[in-house]
């Protein structure tokens, strides 16, 4: 039986390339995005769905909503602005929380890969983007929480992605899935793990 992959964030070039790579490997692939998923209604989404073998989370809402806070504008950041940021993140985060718990209940051998950012390993290098790092870290923790005796869960950071390396990055993600990578954040640019929770 063919393996099944779900790719969330299908509109991005990287997601499209990943889906193409999966198809080449004989993996049935379904892409999900805002045009066919209501992130505010998990029950409607999951109704009648078969548990996939692979889940790719590439929603990338964090970049759109994260506040930029530096040593010049920090006094202008209000409680309302901070609340709005988390409020806008909540539907997507809750959706994926429920998805991970649904997987947990299925007890099926699955791999979860979060397309993320390595900024969570060194937030001090880009201090003004600390809220972006915080949001990315939230999703990374959720992905890692899926790890179990039947589920592998890891994140990759496709930093420096461009037209010349997208296919290579997609092939590497597919290989990491094949290798049953677990509890790691791997930066595809430097080809190294920057976080390893198995240590």
Task: Kindly give the residue locations of the regions a language model identified.
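Conserved mid-core segment of classical short-chain dehydrogenase/reductases
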Residues: 39-43, 58-81
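Rossmann-fold cofactor-recognition segment
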Residues: 30-44
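Short, solvent-exposed loop/turn segments at secondary-structure junctions
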Residues: 14, 38, 120-124
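Catalytic loop of short-chain dehydrogenase/reductase
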Residues: 73-95, 104-105, 109-147, 159-162
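Rossmann-fold NAD(P)-dependent oxidoreductase module
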Residues: 17, 21, 98, 141, ...
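C-terminal helical subdomain
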Residues: 151, 155-157, 161-199
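Rossmann-fold scaffold of SDR-type NAD(P)-dependent oxidoreductases
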Residues: 8, 52-66, 87-88, 113-114, ...
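N-terminal Rossmann NAD(P)H-binding glycine-rich loop of SDR-like oxidoreductase domains
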Residues: 8-20
């Amino acid at each position: 039986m063919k393996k099944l992959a779900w790719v969330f964030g299908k509109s991005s070039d990287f997601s499209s390339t990943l889906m193409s790579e999966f198809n080449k490997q004989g993996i049935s692939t379904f892409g999900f995005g805002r045009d066919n998923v209501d992130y505010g209604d998990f029950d409607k989404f999951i109704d009648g769905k078969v548990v996939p073998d692979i889940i790719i989370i590439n929603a990338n809402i964090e970049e759109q909503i994260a506040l930029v806070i530096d040593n010049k504008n920090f006094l202008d950041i209000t409680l309302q602005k901070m609340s709005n940021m988390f409020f806008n993140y909540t539907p997507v985060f809750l959706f994926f929380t429920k998805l991970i718990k649904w997987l947990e209940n299925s007890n099926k051998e699955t791999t979860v890969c979060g397309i993320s950012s390595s900024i969570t390993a060194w937030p001090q290098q880009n201090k003004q983007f600390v809220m972006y790092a915080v949001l990315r870290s939230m999703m990374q923790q959720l992905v890692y929480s899926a790890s179990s005796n039947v589920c592998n869960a890891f994140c990759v950071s496709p930093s420096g992605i461009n037209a010349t390396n997208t296919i290579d990055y997609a092939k590497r993600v597919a290989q990491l899935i094949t290798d049953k990578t677990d509890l790691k954040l791997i930066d595809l640019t430097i080809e190294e793990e920057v976080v390893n929770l198995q240590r």
